[in-house]
Regions:
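A translation/RNA-centric and nucleic-acid-associated enzymatic feature enriched
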Residues: 350, 355-357, 367
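Active-site/pore-lining binding-face segments in mid-to-C-terminal subdomains
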Residues: 366-368, 372
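Active-site bordering "gate/hinge" segments
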Residues: 1-352, 372-459
Length: 459
């Protein structure tokens, strides 16, 4: 085998949909990019709209309420991915029956784990409901601030269960670590490769999910750039278009198109951070990084372990933030002088998320550029598929085992492109094998119900 590609056939076109709309509408519109992490797009667009409104420095109440929403969003998304989507692979086995390899299968085989995952996600969703009015596609952000603070009753509701949420989150890190180390040799080799890593950090190098500067490190941990103001991202990052996929290929300018690709998300953030500011998550970060030795951790399946470390950090940070009186303040919005460009960058659950808008004098969007987390991980997913195919494809027939392993490799990156279609452990997938001359050697399709077909095969 000489090459493997992950073809993305879904076309969204949001960058064009947004053009011509009033800038203040954008934070609401872009939530429809994703049903699992809409608040991430809401907040990234909100930061860009703040800049358009000339209000980059928010009031303490607006800043902290937005941060609380982001922590709740990340907690629920990480819980959803690990327990609903990935734990069936990890607990039941990569080759388990498709009808079993889902949350219901985990509930039958490991009921306490499944119930804990459901409760963790529900708590994160409750944070969002109390702040935005709805668990999905609620509204919090307005230009220069927020539309409501956190009320006393809502704060009390969230405080009631947070200690249990922290405990369950710590148990989840233990589970993820044990699952990874249970078959360490296989998990380290599975879809593993060297790469650079990109993400936001604080000025002191601490893990940062909402604000901070851009940091990129190479596969050996050496710094490529650091403390870069996100509004300057176009000087450091570019995107390449390739004819065979709708997803672009971002890369670090100084490294060039071929060598400049990078990974984002939990693995990148935990690798890049010098410290995590909450104590339990920091202890787990130290243990995780020790596993990598003198270099960052490269294995694709280590994303799950890093994801649970971040979930623990979110739970701890929510507990700390709920004690802050500023959450209930009344100073919600600041105003400034309108600008023509707005750029907002945050760490979405799946990785660094860029929203870039330009607006005319009437406040209508004239240009939009979005670099979503899945786009940044595009080359990484292609490389993971290539590694897995090289290991499990015999050069002749595509087996169900190969499909299962490709699915596991893609799922480690938690891509938005498939989040709606594999929620029950059933990812529609088509895998074709081509000869050097382009002739199709084999073609297998897995439908959403898990049914396998070979188009053109003799009955």
């Amino acid at each position: 085998m000489t090459q493997a590609r992950l073809h993305i056939v879904e076309f969204r076109g949001f960058e064009k949909f947004i053009t011509g709309r009033a800038f203040w509408e954008v934070p609401v519109l872009v939530q429809r990019l994703c049903g699992i992490c809409p608040i991430s797009h809401h907040l990234a667009a909100g930061k860009a709209v703040d800049m358009l409104a000339g209000a980059r420095v928010l009031t303490p109440t607006a800043d902290k309420v937005r941060r609380l929403a982001h922590l709740g969003q990340t907690l629920q998304s990480h819980a959803l991915h690990f327990f609903h989507l990935s734990s069936p692979d990890l607990l039941l086995g990569f080759d388990a029956e498709v009808g079993q390899r889902n949350l219901l299968g985990v509930l039958a085989a490991h009921p306490e784990v499944a119930r804990r995952g459901i409760a963790l996600r529900a708590y994160g969703q409750e944070v969002l409901r109390l702040l935005t009015g709805k668990r999905v596609h609620g509204v919090l952000v307005v230009p220069g601030g927020i539309n409501q603070a956190l009320g006393a009753a809502a704060r009390a509701t969230l405080q009631r269960d947070i200690d249990q949420i922290v405990t369950w989150s710590q148990d989840s890190v233990t589970l993820a670590r044990e699952l990874y180390l249970r078959d360490e040799a296989r998990n380290q080799a599975f879809g593993s490769f060297r790469s650079s890593f990109l993400g936001l950090t604080r000025a002191d190098g601490a893990l940062e999910l909402y604000d901070g500067g851009l940091r990129a490190r190479d596969a050996d941990g050496a710094t490529i750039f650091d403390h870069v103001d996100p509004v300057e991202y176009t000087r450091y990052l570019r995107e390449e278009v390739r004819s065979w996929t709708y997803l672009k290929f971002p890369y670090i300018v100084s490294r060039g198109r071929d060598a400049g690709w990078y990974r984002v998300g939990p693995l990148a953030r935990v690798n890049n951070a010098d410290v995590i500011t909450t104590p339990l998550a920091e202890a787990e970060r130290v243990r995780f990084r020790a596993h990598g030795g003198t270099t960052p951790v490269w294995a694709s399946l280590a994303y799950h372990w890093a994801r649970m470390i971040e979930m623990l950090h979110c739970a701890e940070a929510i507990r700390e933030l709920l004690a802050d009186a500023d959450l209930g303040g009344s100073d919600l919005v600041v105003k400034g002088e309108r600008q023509g460009t707005g750029i907002g960058v945050i760490e979405a659950p799946r990785g660094t998320l860029f929203h870039h808008y330009e607006a005319d004098a009437q406040g209508l969007i004239t240009r939009c550029n979005l670099i979503v987390s899945t786009t940044s991980n595009n080359q990484a997913m292609n490389t993971a598929v290539e590694r897995v195919a090289a290991q499990y494809f015999d050069g002749r027939a595509i087996t169900e085992g190969l499909l299962n392993h490709i699915e596991v490799a893609i799922r480690a990156y938690d891509p938005c492109l498939s989040c709606a279609t594999h929620a029950l452990g059933q990812m529609p997938l088509e895998v074709s094998a081509l000869a050097p001359d382009g002739a199709v050697v084999d073609l297998v399709r897995r439908a959403a119900d898990g049914t396998l077909t070979r188009p053109g095969a003799t009955p």
